[in-house]
Amino acid sequence: EITNLPECHLPFLQYIAVEAVGKPNGSWRRIAQGEGLRGWTIKTQNNIFGYSDWNINRPANAWYCTHLWQHYAYNNDLEYLRNIAFPVMQSTCKYWFDRLKENKDGKLVAPDEWSPEQGPWEDGVAYAQQLVWQLFNETLHAVEALKKVDIQIDNVFVSELADKFRKLDNGVSVGSWGQIKEWKEDKGKLDFQGNDHRHLSQLIALYPGNQISYHRDTLLADAAKVTLQSRGDMGTGWSRAWKIACWARLFDGDHAYRLLKSALSLSTLTVISMDNSKGGVYENLFDSHPPFQIDGNFGATAGIAEMLLQSNQGFIHLLPALPLAWSDGSVAGLRTEGDFTFTMKWNAGWLTQCSVLSGSGLKCRIYSPKGLIARVENSSGKRIPISLIKGGLIEFPTKKGE
């Protein structure tokens, strides 16, 4: 979505909708039924025919739903939200309504879950909690968007969703050495300083989620930084790509850039390896786990986009993680939530020019610490009034197609 290729996202979204709710006796629904639960869920590996295998990965149903919501957030297509995204999100919520249980602290937790790909199975693992939080939060936003245009939603469902969300453990807490805890109980396990495991499962809330941000909570963002520092900069190809995006979300462009260079280091190994030193790319720029895994290519591209433009906190942040190596430059065609397409130029690290194309005619809210926006004009050169929200955050009206 951020690279302005939503048509490349749609086949995956349609696949999710068909397999999750379009087949009454589909394999994804049968997994949930086998557990005595409503809704659907999946395992780690899934093919184009809906076959799911290797290991149960229940929270991945919530992860899939983040894609469904993201497409709406970028396109504002209410028919898509009503007919494709929301039915899947609602079904997924019902799965978790049935599965969550109350912990001794009174919070709702996902029982017997894993932190991919290490450690014990236990209740309230950060990976599961953060994804269920994201699911419930985005489904509530979907309900709000549909109700604004008088689309009727089951009130019993909405009430239960709000109640479960209020009681849910959000999966984000700080541990004994200042890290985001990977497991609910801080007993050491594998959650020790210096563990350089390739996965960042406890940082789903940083990226691709939006629960951790310096715009929200400095303490939690600092803890995410401690966690990333502990994991180190090495990793499989896709792991390095994930770290690029995470450092971009923490507004550290120089660190993200170092990881980008690392992700582009030459790899020659073509057999399966979990050695963190073997990741990179092959001579044809295919990502090397090793062997080839395309998520590293997609992830690195997404990370670069995150360095230049972010919109995950309800406003658009221009040049949030610009590295010193890119002090002068330009970019065209990147897209944000709210259906805005941006062209930007900068010099010596400061924004010098910015144009915005509004795809839906919504109000545009921008945060630009890398350059003061003193004047906004429409395509005819007429000045548009700016509202100053707070702390460098501005808002102005837009017209669809301009």
Name these PLM-found stretches.
Residues 1-21, 46, 53, 57-75, ...:
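Active-site core of glycosidic bond-cleaving carbohydrate-active enzymes
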Residues 12, 25-28, 86, 93, ...:
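Beta-sheet entry/capping signal
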Residues 22-41:
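Surface-exposed loop and adjacent secondary-structure segments within mature catalytic domains
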Residues 37-49, 135, 139-147, 151, ...:
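Mature extracytoplasmic enzyme cores
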Residues 75, 83-95:
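Serine-hydrolase-like catalytic core of hydrolytic proteins
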Residues 90-145:
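Acidic/histidine-rich catalytic neighborhood
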Residues 105, 254-401:
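Non-catalytic C-terminal accessory modules of carbohydrate-active enzymes
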Residues 113, 161-169, 319-326:
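A glycine-rich phosphate-binding loop feature that marks nucleotide/adenosyl-phosphate handling sites
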